[in-house]
Every structure is written in structure tokens, then in C-alpha cells.
């Protein structure tokens, strides 16, 4: 999506559709920062006074600027608390976002700038208490401000404390971004990219530094270069209050906030219970402070206005001021100007990459006018005011007037007319009288000048922050890539495991079906064999029975013939008796044969039943053998599959281990490369800073050398004047002495006396001339030596300071490198432990599964054998009941009936 083209409905809902240039009127610049400017304005529909923060999202880093705007708007929309700035809406106009908020008088840093002295402890407690309520609200919703400082703590007319500037805020806690203003940054924020995450306690640290700022007018380490301050904060002890005038309660509060270890640092909710903020204080302490500040600002602005008015009057009457008039004017107002301009204030800090509404913004209301409307020049200015576009502000810089477009798009245009410059300055101070504020006009102008002059330093810090965030994005991108690679790897392994499990299941199903088919086939074969066996026995028995019957018939005939022969030989027995005996014998023989036949049939039936029973037992035993073979085959198959699965899992573990080590090496290599790049950038920035400081000092010394002839000329003129005064005195003394000598000496000696006096005067003048020349030479030599010594001392001091800062940077980088190496060692050890533990778990799992498989094998075989044994035992018991005895020792006849 092209920035500013609101195609996404969710993003479009963040912005109002009205034209802000028509909706808001009377724009007046009241603050300036890296993002642009903050304006006082009035809602044309409701007459409500608001503050407007204009943020351009064109030019360099367009996408980043647009994302910052979206983040800040989303953040502000969800805030509903008395101690956070009230959000009024956001509008878009020509690649500029107009962020509209409630109007406040100014910031806590403005109080320091106006009064030029620290706040009272009771005032610091009141401001801190209000800020803590706002922080506790943010932290309770897992939000982090990340840029707490006096410039971002605003005050309203009724004395309400408001947290502002959420351009650096985080909607996630914990966070891990390098953002904020250097001097107020917590150590864990500075080390965020290197060591991990942080939470809302970073705001507690910043609040502690803010307390030092309010108590000492500057945050800790403010005399350092901003980059050096970062290195100092990251590795040195926490700062403390320097003066002994503060109470122990305040000192403990600051020390409590500035605990180096985040886990030992209190939360904002815990700090609300601290004695420092809970103790009694006047209800109007902030209202009175604001009123005193407003009065002081009014006096400063009136002083500036009167100066402009006087210059205007003199210029109108006499033309441009001469040098002496300017000197006189400067001497008249020098004290107030020096008092206004002797401090850079919190604006010396490097603005964060994210935009700020804090020290760069303050609010305005109505105020009394103190202009003298009777003067014709002021009437002229009043008339001219209507011709000045309300969307532009006038900024006086050096010898030109720059017309700055309020939207921040226009380029400065030099106006060569000095009269117009003076009128614009006077008009600027007159317009200031229309609203109440705790920020003086000179402070607003100075912020604009500093913003332009410190662009190089600000760009360096912005570039450093961009680099840190870019490094963090690279690490996150690599971590996500490696995570995706690991997820893909694990998914691949999981699919392979699932495929193996499915294949194993399919193989077992096939084996089960095969075994069922074999059992069914064996059952059919056994049934056929049994039937065949029975038929063979029956056929044989039938054959035996036929043979037996034929044998009986033959035997019957033989016996019959034998009896007949015996009867025929016995002649003594009557024929009838013979017949009876033959019949009886035949009956006995038939009866015997019938019994033998019945016995044979009984024996055949018993033989048939017993052999069929034995055959069934053999079939059952054979079936048992098949079942045993099947279960062994199934269990062997399962064991083979399990061994293949275990080999696959070991291979997976080794491939995962190799991937994990490779990924860790890749991540650590990138981290070390980024740290080397960061350290190289830090070193380059420090060297560039050193060169800039040396150039500035050299430029200053060159200016001093250029200025020295003028100074020497002035001092020479002063000595010359003293010489002239001495000459005049000596001339007067000479005349008085001459007159006296002429009066007291005879006339004839006058010529000699005059000659003597003339020679004496000439001698003394010659001595005086020699003294004059000597004084001039000594003065020039002394001044040259003094300048050389002063410049050499400044050079030595600068070299010492830069050397200390370089040593601080080297120590910081060494510490970061050591911490990173220690972190890498911990990560490697952690990975080794994880890999070792995972391998141990895998081996334990393999052992347990093999043991479970062996146990299953033993139990199933045992259960099968027990079941088969019970089945055989039951069969044998039934055979015994049937009267077959022990079938185990039964032998089949030679004919194999099976």
C-alpha cells in the first residue's frame, strides 16, 4: 500500500476525513524536534485549544515513518487516564499526519529552563507522583513508555501531570528494541539487542534519572557525549544525587529507581507506596509553581519585546544603529539575555528515532497584552499582522529572517531587509502575549536553532538506532527462518515416522490376513484328511469283516464236514441222536461265529473311534504348531519393525542434532558479525565525533587568533590613552614647574632654566615612551602567551576527554563482546544438554519399548501355550471319559490313514 493511501479499512478508521487546515486555525509553533514541530491551534468549530504534532512521512525512511505514525496513533487511542495526554484525533494532509492532543502549558524541563535552578523537593515529589500514576496505568496494561524524561512530563493549568510522547512506546511487554533518549535509557534497553528482553521497569529507571534531572537541572552524565553516555550507563554503577541538601527519603527513592539489576528494581505500583511520594505536601504546590513560571515567562517575553520595540523606535527615527548604540543596548539587556541563553537544557539530549511531544512540545492559552498600543510603530505592526499568514512562523537567525512553513515543508528564504526582521521579531513577542505558557519565546526559538545546528549529531544517533533496530530485525528474521526450517525438518521427520507406522500397520494386517488364510486352509486340509482317514478305516474294517465272514463260512463248512465224518464213523449212535447232535453242534458253531462277529464289530468300532479321536488330537497339535509359528512370525515382524523404527529415530535425532548445531552456529555467527559491525560503527561515530570536537576547538582557536589583533588593538589603545593621560599630566606639571621656576629665579637665568626644564621634560617623555613601548610589548607577549597557554590547555583537556571516552567505548565493546561470547557459550551448553537429554530419553524410550515388546512376546507365547495346554488337557480328559486311555502313546497301524 502506498503510504497515506488508506485502502485498509482498519487503518482508515484511525484517521479523520476532515481537512485539518480548515478545521484548525491560528497555528503557532511552540516546540520543535526531530519529527518536525508542535503547534498551538484552535478548533474552528468548537473553539477548543489543542496542541498539534505534525509528522511528515515523506522523504527518507518513508515506510518506517509511516509505521511509527500508525503505532503512535494506535497507542494513543487506547489511553484513558487522567495522567496521560488526551488524544483528540489524527488527520492526514499532503504526506503529513496532524496528531491532535489536549493542550498543556509545557513540560517539567521548561520549568528548569525558565527558572534556571533545580525544583524544590516537594515539587519534584508532586511531579513524580503524577508520573507514577500514569506509568502504573500503562504497566498494568502491559504497555511501556520507553522515553520518560522531564521533557515528556507535561503540566496543565490546574496542575495535572500528564505523560506525553508515546512515539517510542511499546504495546508489548516484554520488549526488546533499542529506543529512547540516551541519558535516560535503562541499561537493559541499551543492551536489548545483545542480551534479551525488558519490561516496564525501564520506565522506572528513566523516572529515577528524571528525578536527578529535576534536582540538578541535567540528567546524569549530561556532560558526556551522548554515545559515550550509553557506554557508561551499560557498564558502570548507577548514578546518585550529588548534593547533600536532599532528604534521605528522596535519596532512597532515586537509588531504588536506579537499581542496576531489573529484578531488584521496583515496579511503578510499588513506588506509589514509597514515603517520598506519599508524604504530605501542599495541595497547590504545582499550581503555585506553574503560576510563578508563567509570571517569569511573561517577564522574559516582555523584556525581549521591549528590546525589540526600542530597536524599532531607534531604527525608525535614526536609521540603523551604530556600533556604540548596539553596545549600549547589549549592556542594558545583557543580564537577562545571558540568563536566558546560558543553558542548552534537556534539548542537548539526542532525540529518539521515534517522534516526541515532550520536551519539544508545550501548550498555550490566553494571556494579557502588555504592548504599548499608543505608539504609531505598534499600530503599524498591528496592521501588518493581518497580512501575515497564520500558517507560517517567523524565526530570526543570524542576519536574515527565515519564513518557515508551519507544516515543515517550506525552505528558508532570506529576507534582506533588517527593518522587516526587527518588526517580525517584535510581532513574534507580541503574539506570545496571547496565550499563557511556561515556555519562553527564546526557548522555542532556541529549540529551532538547535534542531538545525545539531542535525549532524542527531542524524548520527538516529542512524545508530536505525542500525540497532535493523540488526534486531535481521536477527529476528534469521530466527524465524531457522524456526521455519526446523519446523519443516520436524514435519518431515514426523511424516516419515507416520509413514513407517502406517507401513508397519499395513504389513501386520497383511500378515494377519495371511495367517488367517493359512489357518483356514489348514482347517480345510485337516477336515479333508480326517474324512479320508475315516473312510480308509471304514473301508479296511469292511474288508476285514468280509474276510472274517468268509473265514467263518469256511470254518463252518469244515466243522460241519468234520462232524458229519465223525458221526458217520460212529455207527453205534442212533441216527436221530446223530441228527440232534449235529444240529446242536451247528447251533453252537453259529452262536460262536455270531459272537466272534459281534466282537469283531465292537473291536472295529472301538478302533475307529479311538483312531479318529487320536487323529483329531494330532490335528489339534498341528494347529497349535501353526498358531505358535504364526505368533512367532508376528512377534518377529513387530520386533523387526520396532528395530527399524528405533534406527530411524536415532537417525532423526542425529539429523536434528546436526541441524540444531548448524542453526546455532549460523545465528551466533550473524550475531557476532552484527556486533562487529555495531562496534565498527560505534568506533567510526566516536572518531567522527572526536574530529568534529577537534574541528570545533580549532575553529574556536582560529576565531580567537583572528579576534586577538582587535583585542590587542583595544588594549594598545587603552595603554596609549593612559600614556596620553600621563603625558598631559606631565605637561601640566612641566608648565606649573616652569612658571614657578621663572617666578622665583632672576630673569637672566630664565634661558638656562627653560633649557634645563626642556631637557628634563624630554628625558622624562623619552623614559615614558620607553615604558609605553615596553608595556605594549609586554602586553602583546603576555596576551599571546596567555592565549597559547589557554588554547593548549583546552587542547589537552579535549584530548584527555576524548581519550577517556575512547577508553570507555573500548571497555564497553569488550564487555559486550565478552557477554556475547558468554551468551554463546551458555547457548552451546544449553543445546548440548538438550541434545544429550533428548538422546538419553530416546535411548530410554528404545529400551522401554524393546522391554515392552519382549514382555508382550513372552506373555502372548505364554498365554498361547497355556491355552493350548488347557485345550489338550480338556481333550484328553474327554478322551478318558470316553474310555480311550492315553492317546499320546497310541501308534497308528502300518497303514497310514492320515
Swiss-Prot record:
Q: Which residues carry this modification: N6-acetyllysine?
A: 830
* Chaperone among keywords: no
A single Gene Ontology MF term assigned here is: protein serine kinase activity
Topology within the bilayer: Peripheral membrane protein
Which UniProt keyword terms apply here?
Acetylation, ATP-binding, Cell membrane, Coiled coil, Cytoplasm, DNA damage, DNA repair, Kinase, Lipid droplet, Membrane, Nucleotide-binding, Phosphoprotein, Serine/threonine-protein kinase, Transferase
Biological process GO annotation list? DNA damage response; DNA repair; mitotic G2 DNA damage checkpoint signaling; positive regulation of stress-activated MAPK cascade; regulation of cytoskeleton organization
Which SMART domains does the entry link to? Answer: S_TKc
Q: What is its main location?
A: cytoplasm
Per the record, residues carrying Phosphoserine are 324, 331, 343, 346, 349, 359, 442
| Annotated localization | Cytoplasm; Cell membrane; Membrane raft; Lipid droplet
Catalysis: reaction(s):
L-seryl-[protein] + ATP = O-phospho-L-seryl-[protein] + ADP + H(+); L-threonyl-[protein] + ATP = O-phospho-L-threonyl-[protein] + ADP + H(+)
Q: What is its EC number?
A: 2.7.11.1
Residues that bear Phosphothreonine? 357
Comp. bias regions, Low complexity: 352-362
Per the Swiss-Prot or TrEMBL record, the active site comprises 147
Comp. bias (Basic and acidic residues)? 405-416
Processing and modification events after translation: Autophosphorylated. Phosphorylation at Ser-324 by ATM following DNA damage is required for activation of the p38/MAPK14 stress-activated MAPK cascade. Phosphorylated at Ser-324 and on Tyr residues during T cell activation. Phosphorylated by LRRK2.
Entry superkingdom:
Eukaryota
Described by its record, this protein's role is as follows: Serine/threonine-protein kinase that acts as a regulator of the p38/MAPK14 stress-activated MAPK cascade and of the MAPK8/JNK cascade. In response to DNA damage, involved in the G2/M transition DNA damage checkpoint by activating the p38/MAPK14 stress-activated MAPK cascade, probably by mediating phosphorylation of upstream MAP2K3 and MAP2K6 kinases. Inhibits basal activity of the MAPK8/JNK cascade and diminishes its activation in response to epidermal growth factor (EGF).
Identification of the protein by name: Serine/threonine-protein kinase TAO3
**Species whose genome carries this gene:** Pongo abelii (Sumatran orangutan)
Q: Which gene encodes it?
A: TAOK3
Amino acid at each position: 500500500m502506498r503510504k497515506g493511501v488508506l485502502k485498509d479499512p482498519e487503518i482508515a478508521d484511525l484517521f479523520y476525513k476532515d481537512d485539518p487546515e480548515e478545521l484548525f486555525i491560528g497555528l503557532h509553533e511552540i516546540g520543535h524536534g526531530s519529527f518536525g514541530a508542535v503547534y498551538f491551534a484552535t478548533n474552528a468549530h468548537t473553539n477548543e485549544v489543542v496542541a498539534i504534532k505534525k509528522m511528515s512521512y515523506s522523504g527518507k525512511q518513508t515506510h518506517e515513518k509511516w509505521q511509527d505514525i500508525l503505532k503512535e496513533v494506535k497507542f494513543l487511542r487506547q489511553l484513558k487516564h487522567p495522567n496521560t495526554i488526551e488524544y483528540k484525533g489524527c488527520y492526514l494532509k499532503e504526506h503529513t499526519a496532524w496528531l491532535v492532543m489536549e493542550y498543556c502549558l509545557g513540560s517539567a524541563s521548561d520549568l528548569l529552563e525558565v527558572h534556571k535552578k533545580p525544583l524544590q523537593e516537594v515539587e519534584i515529589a508532586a511531579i513524580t507522583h503524577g508520573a507514577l500514576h500514569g506509568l502504573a496505568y500503562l504497566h498494568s496494561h502491559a504497555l511501556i513508555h520507553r522515553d520518560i524524561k522531564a521533557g515528556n512530563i507535561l503540566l496543565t493549568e490546574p496542575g495535572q501531570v500528564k505523560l506525553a510522547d508515546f512515539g517510542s512506546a511499546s504495546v508489548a511487554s516484554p520488549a526488546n528494541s533499542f529506543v529512547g533518549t540516551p541519558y535516560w535509557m535503562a541499561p537493559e534497553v541499551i543492551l536489548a539487542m545483545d542480551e534479551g528482553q525488558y519490561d516496564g521497569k525501564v520506565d522506572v529507571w528513566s523516572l529515577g534519572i528524571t528525578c536527578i534531572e529535576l534536582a540538578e537541572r541535567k540528567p546524569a552524565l549530561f556532560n558526556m557525549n551522548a554515545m559515550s553516555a550509553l557506554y557508561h550507563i551499560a557498564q558502570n554503577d548507577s548514578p546518585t544525587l550529588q548534593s547533600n541538601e536532599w532528604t534521605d527519603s528522596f535519596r532512597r527513592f532515586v537509588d531504588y529507581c536506579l537499581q542496576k539489576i531489573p529484578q531488584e528494581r521496583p515496579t511503578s505500583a510499588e513506588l506509589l507506596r514509597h514515603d517520598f511520594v506519599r508524604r504530605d505536601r501542599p495541595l497547590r504546590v504545582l499550581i503555585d509553581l506553574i503560576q510563578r513560571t508563567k509570571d517569569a515567562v511573561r517577564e522574559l517575553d516582555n523584556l525581549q519585546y521591549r528590546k525589540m520595540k526600542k530597536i524599532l523606535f531607534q531604527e525608525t527615527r535614526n536609521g540603523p544603529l551604530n556600533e556604540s548604540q548596539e553596545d549600549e543596548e547589549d549592556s542594558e539587556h545583557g543580564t537577562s539575555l545571558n540568563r536566558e541563553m546560558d543553558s542548552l537544557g534537556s534539548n542537548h539530549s539526542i532525540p529518539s528515532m521515534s517522534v516526541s511531544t515532550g520536551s519539544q512540545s508545550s501548550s498555550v492559552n490566553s494571556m494579557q497584552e502588555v504592548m504599548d498600543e499608543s505608539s504609531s510603530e505598534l499600530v503599524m505592526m498591528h496592521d501588518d499582522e493581518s497580512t501575515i499568514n497564520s500558517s507560517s512562523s517567523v524565526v530570526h537567525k543570524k542576519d536574515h529572517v527565515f519564513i518557515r512553513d508551519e507544516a515543515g515543508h517550506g525552505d528558508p528564504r532570506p529576507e534582506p531587509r533588517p527593518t522587516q526582521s526587527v518588526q517580525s521579531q517584535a510581532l513574534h513577542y507580541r503574539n506570545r502575549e496571547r496565550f499563557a505558557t511556561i515556555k519562553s519565546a527564546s526557548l522555542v526559538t532556541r529549540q529551532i536553532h538547535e534542531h538545525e545546528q545539531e542535525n549532524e549529531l542527531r542524524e548520527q544517533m538516529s542512524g545508530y538506532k536505525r542500525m540497532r533496530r535493523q540488526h534486531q530485525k535481521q536477527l529476528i528474521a534469521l530466527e524465524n527462518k531457522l524456526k521455519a526450517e526446523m519446523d519443516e525438518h520436524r514435519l518431515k521427520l514426523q511424516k516419515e515416522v507416520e509413514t513407517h507406522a502406517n507401513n508397519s500397520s499395513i504389513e501386520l494386517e497383511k500378515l494377519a490376513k495371511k495367517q488367517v488364510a493359512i489357518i483356514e486352509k489348514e482347517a480345510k486340509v485337516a477336515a479333508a484328511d480326517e474324512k479320508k482317514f475315516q473312510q480308509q478305516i471304514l473301508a479296511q474294517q469292511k474288508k476285514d469283516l468280509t474276510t472274517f465272514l468268509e473265514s467263518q463260512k469256511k470254518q463252518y463248512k469244515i466243522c460241519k464236514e468234520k462232524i458229519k465224518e465223525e458221526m458217520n464213523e460212529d455207527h453205534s449212535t442212533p441216527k436221530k441222536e446223530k441228527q440232534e447232535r449235529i444240529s446242536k453242534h451247528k447251533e453252537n458253531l453259529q452262536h460262536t461265529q455270531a459272537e466272534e462277529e459281534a466282537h469283531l464289530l465292537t473291536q472295529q468300532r472301538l478302533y475307529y473311534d479311538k483312531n479318529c479321536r487320536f487323529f483329531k488330537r494330532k490335528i489339534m497339535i498341528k494347529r497349535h504348531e501353526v498358531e505358535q509359528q504364526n505368533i512367532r512370525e508376528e512377534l518377529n515382524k513387530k520386533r523387526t519393525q520396532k528395530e527399524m523404527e528405533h534406527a530411524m529415530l536415532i537417525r532423526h535425532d542425529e539429523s536434528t542434532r546436526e541441524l540444531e548445531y548448524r542453526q546455532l552456529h549460523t545465528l551466533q555467527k550473524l550475531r557476532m558479525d552484527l556486533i562487529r559491525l555495531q562496534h565498527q560503527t560505534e568506533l567510526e561515530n566516536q572518531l567522527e565525533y572526536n574530529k568534529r570536537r577537534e574541528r570545533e576547538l580549532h575553529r574556536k582557536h582560529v576565531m580567537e587568533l583572528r579576534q586577538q589583533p582587535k583585542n590587542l588593538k583595544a588594549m594598545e589603545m587603552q595603554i596609549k590613552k593612559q600614556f596620553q593621560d600621563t603625558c598631559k599630566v606631565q605637561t601640566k606639571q612641566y608648565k606649573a614647574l616652569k612658571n614657578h621656576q621663572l617666578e622665583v629665579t632672576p630673569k637672566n637665568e630664565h634661558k638656562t632654566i627653560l633649557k634645563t626644564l626642556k631637557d628634563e621634560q624630554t628625558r622624562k617623555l623619552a623614559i615614558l615612551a620607553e615604558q609605553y613601548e615596553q608595556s605594549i610589548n609586554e602586553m602583546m607577549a603576555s596576551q599571546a602567551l596567555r592565549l597559547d597557554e589557554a588554547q593548549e590547555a583546552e587542547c589537552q583537556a579535549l584530548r584527555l576527554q576524548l581519550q577517556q571516552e575512547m577508553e570507555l567505548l573500548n571497555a564497553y565493546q569488550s564487555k559486550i563482546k565478552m557477554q556475547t561470547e558468554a551468551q554463546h557459550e551458555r547457548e552451546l551448553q544449553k543445546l548440548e544438554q538438550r541434545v544429550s537429554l533428548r538422546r538419553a530419553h530416546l535411548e530410554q524410550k528404545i529400551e522401554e519399548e524393546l522391554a515392552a515388546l519382549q514382555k508382550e512376546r513372552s506373555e502372548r507365547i505364554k498365554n498361547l501355550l497355556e491355552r493350548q495346554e488347557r485345550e489338550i488337557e480338556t481333550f484328553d480328559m474327554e478322551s478318558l471319559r470316553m474310555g480311550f486311555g492315553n492317546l499320546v502313546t497310541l501308534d497308528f497301524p502300518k497303514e497310514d490313514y492320515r
